[in-house]
């Protein structure tokens, strides 16, 4: 299984990309900054599409938070195969 981390994945293009990645059987890192409910809904749709994933809250303008987010994702997924910086 390949792993993808998507920034801004709780809505719009990021969410659509997360769902398509799930259809391709990828493990999806769903990043959001403020809308936890939308991130939860995205994860539910990822799972409905046959995939799995993790929700990662992070303000991508904060470089230390981004490093932490990548570490959390790698710990859960094992590796990072792709990043979609939305």
Where do the language-model regions lie?
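The beta1-alpha1 cofactor-binding region of Rossmann-like NAD(H)/NADP(H)-dependent oxidoreductases
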Residues: 36, 57-70
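Conserved glycine-rich Rossmann-like NAD(P)H-binding loop of the short-chain dehydrogenase/reductase
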Residues: 26-41
